[in-house]
């Protein structure tokens, strides 16, 4: 959403897969893949393993923020069995995988550690980021996504970001006509007011 709010992206897709994982994709600039000058690791690893590393490393990059202050990506990674990042940026498609596994040396679960180096998959003209993750069932009692809860939240985000197109796909849905929903509201909040008043008689137009 930060990419959208700052004019770098116009569409987002959210997919719930049959294996319990979920994917979120945007058409923004893509997660940086260059080496961080101070930490000596790729931008993908910084953003997905370090707290407060959002904003593409530069606080001036975003005039507006969704409010998570750079912790969202790293927290999702830490709470996932595995997470795969696909970043399309600078003419290349890059991929990196993270997993949470037991570390015998430390005698504890090591959450969200990189298990593959950042790999350049191919050249591409595409730009944006796709993240696929599986919630960790050793952390959460319930890991099954509630489609209606996700759908409601995405609808609200579409209302709050006028002109943004959000596509929601639930692969678990048996009815093909209900698998895909697209939210896009050119009127923004005014459309939202009309939506919540759809079963009421308005006093003013």
Where are the predicted features?
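Short basic (Lys/Arg) and small-residue
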Residues: 47
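Short, intrinsically disordered, charge-balanced linker/junction segments flanking boundaries
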Residues: 200-205
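Conserved catalytic core of two-component histidine kinases
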Residues: 14-16
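Structural motif corresponding to the C-terminal cap of alpha-helices
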Residues: 1-8, 51-59
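GHKL-type ATPase core
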Residues: 18-38, 43, 54-186, 192-195
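Conserved ATP-binding N-box helix of the HATPase_c
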Residues: 1-12, 72-79
């Amino acid at each position: 959403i930060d990419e959208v709010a700052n004019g770098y992206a116009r569409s987002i897709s959210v997919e719930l897969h049959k294996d319990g994982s979920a994917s979120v994709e945007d058409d923004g600039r893509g997660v940086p893949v260059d080496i961080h000058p101070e930490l000596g690791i790729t931008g993908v690893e910084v953003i997905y393993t370090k707290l407060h590393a959002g904003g593409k490393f530069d606080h001036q990059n975003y005039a507006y923020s969704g409010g998570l202050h750079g912790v969202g990506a790293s927290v999702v990674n830490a709470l996932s069995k595995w997470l795969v990042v696909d970043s399309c940026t600078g003419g290349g498609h890059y991929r990196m995988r993270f997993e949470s596994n037991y570390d015998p040396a430390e005698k504890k679960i090591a959450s969200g550690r990189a298990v593959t180096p950042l790999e350049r998959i191919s050249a591409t003209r595409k730009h944006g980021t796709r993240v696929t993750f599986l919630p960790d069932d050793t952390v959460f009692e319930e890991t099954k996504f509630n489609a209606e809860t996700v759908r409601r939240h995405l609808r609200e985000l579409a209302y709050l970001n006028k002109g943004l197109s959000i596509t929601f796909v639930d692969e678990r849905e048996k009815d093909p006509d209900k698998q895909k929903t697209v939210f896009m509201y050119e009127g923004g909040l005014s459309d939202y007011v009309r939506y919540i008043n759809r079963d009421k008689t308005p006093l003013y137009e």
